[in-house]
Amino acid sequence: MYHYQQGQKAHEGTGGLNILYLGFAGRIVKGLSVGANIGYLFGTTYNDVYAHTNTSSTSLFEQIIQVRDYHLDFGIQYRLEINRRHALSAGLTYSPGKTLLGHTWVQKYDINSDAAPDTIGYASIRNRFSIPDTWGAGIAYEWNRALFVEADFTYQPWSKAKIGHQEDFTSTTFCDRYRVGLGAAYTPAQRGGYLRRITYRLGGHWARDYMEIGTNHVREYGLSCGFGFPAPGGKTVINLGFDWIHRSCTPQALVTENYFNIRLGVNFNQLWFMQSKLR
């Protein structure tokens, strides 16, 4: 914790966490599949407090949190083929919570001076910052290998997570997070003209976020649409998606945010390194 004289303050935050992972999946018996993701969690966040005192001096207190850790996800899915045209699927996912590994420290800058910053309180974040378990469940309906409709639910008990000390954010606490999603994807034909082989996607979601400001919860809802463009050869799909997300506080509308995201991804379905067999 750091202190300064009476005056005005301004806050600014940047950064975030990223994950790089490898996924593995396989079928145990007919209709039953299991999978797992092994990920590397990394990133840096910056919480800046600008302090302007009554003596006309300005200081910057920058709290830096650097994370370097692993992350695991597990899943199981069962698929029931009712007949040649209709199928149902149900799945469960679980990601274990854990204390985060990394370091945190504060750097103090004197804005009115060119002097090097002072480093305050360099320490490990182990047992001070953590992420909770994540539970997920979903059901899906498939028609004629062309139409997919899916609903899913996600729960994260953020109220049990550790977040350490955040300067001037004592009124902000964490609460459990819920998310409900519904989406559909339609591919007119697996073969034929190119436009008929494009996959069209549409979905929406509602969530109660994990932040609680005083007695106000953060609500979020959004809509998304996208397309899957098959590449020549049919083994690779280029995915383009658009998201609109609205976030606001309730019962008091403290802050209202609107986001528009564009997503681009590639799915590789080629059986690399596998030699063809003569029959």
Where are the model-predicted features located?
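Outer-membrane beta-barrel porins/channels
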Residues: 1-279
